[in-house]
Amino acid sequence: MVDWELMKKIIESPGVSGYEHLGIRDLVVDILKDVADEVKIDKLGNVIAHFKGSAPKVMVAAHMDKIGLMVNHIDKDGYLRVVPIGGVLPETLIAQKIRFFTEKGERYGVVGVLPPHLRREAKDQGGKIDWDSIIVDVGASSREEAEEMGFRIGTIGEFAPNFTRLSEHRFATPYLDDRICLYAMIEAARQLGEHEADIYIVASVQEEIGLRGARVASFAIDPEVGIAMDVTFAKQPNDKGKIVPELGKGPVMDVGPNINPKLRQFADEVAKKYEIPLQVEPSPRPTGTDANVMQINREGVATAVLSIPIRYMHSQVELADARDVDNTIKLAKALLEELKPMDFTP
């Protein structure tokens, strides 16, 4: 069963892309230092935990960064304008709370919306929301007051925490991408038994702005096998039948050119051995995960993507099923324990 308290703590810890040092990095170090043989932080901010073995050398990566916001203007009335860090849709911000990390500590702001009573003209009835529409109210009445509160050009913000249990197994919260897989990776590492593989567990940085952390970590580690753990899309209303994975049916593994066929077959065999449900997702092009850069590191790496399906990705109400999380932990643990030296040449 999942550790709800630890999972929530990992999800809600601060860490927008490039600012992972605000919270999540040290939390990951504190957890892994008690179980790994060695834990270090590289110059980009990746946390790399080494579980010593012989062969093959395997790198497992789950990104710890979040999409977020940066203040780029404070007007004379104390309102903030913001720009996105990573793939933030402006419409997801309307009437929502934002958590900021200022020089004077955490502050909150709200993105206002024009009340229906004041919408008289057709142009006020809706339409496309763009970044010019996003105005953040932090409770200040002037630029000077906002600055006194600690806000500056460059202040970082993220979706406010809002972890909600919806039913016995399902829950919604901002930042399941990718904190839910980060939790699963950490939990698999904590539960790891005997293993032949030489294992590097990597909490990677800056994935949301270009897979940057995994690129440098894979160069330093030079693994033979690379497994990216990241969320994927689950069937949801109005998806027009384009999405294959479903909630509650288990973890997901891609098939496609970014995936080593022998590693994929090995994963299928392990899942069957341990009776772990495993869904398949077609990926006809390089995935948007850390496996993309791991695969083409140095002389090439045998890569796979292990995913947890979620609904409503990159919103404040990302939704997952705890049974999928639990089965992902079981499969990740089993893969690492079962991995032996083999020829991964396709």
Curated annotation (Swiss-Prot):
Superkingdom of the organism of origin: Archaea
EC numbers: 3.4.11.15
The organism's taxonomic lineage, starting at the top: Archaea, Methanobacteriati, Methanobacteriota, Thermococci, Thermococcales
Disulphide bridges: none
NCBIfam families the UniProt entry points to: lys_aminopep_Arch (NF040822)
Chain positions recorded as Zn(2+) 1 binding sites: H63, D177, D230
Thermal effects: Optimum temperature is 100 degrees Celsius.
Keywords of this entry: Aminopeptidase, Hydrolase, Metal-binding, Metalloprotease, Protease, Zinc
Cofactor: how bound: Binds 2 Zn(2+) ions per subunit.
UniProt function note: Hydrolyzes di-, tri- and tetrapeptides with a lysine as the N-terminal amino acid and with Gly, Lys, Ala, Phe or Glu in the second position.
Source species of the chain: Pyrococcus furiosus (strain ATCC 43587 / DSM 3638 / JCM 8422 / Vc1)
Binding partners and assembly: Homotetramer.
Residues reported in the UniProt entry to bind Zn(2+) 2: D177, E208, H314
Name this protein carries in UniProt: Lysyl aminopeptidase
GO terms assigned for molecular function: aminopeptidase activity; metal ion binding; metallopeptidase activity
EC main group: hydrolase
pH behavior: Optimum pH is 8.
Catalysis: reaction(s): Preferentially, release of N-terminal lysine
GO BP terms: proteolysis
Active site (record annotation): E207
Needed cofactors: Zn(2+)
Similarity annotation: Belongs to the peptidase M42 family.
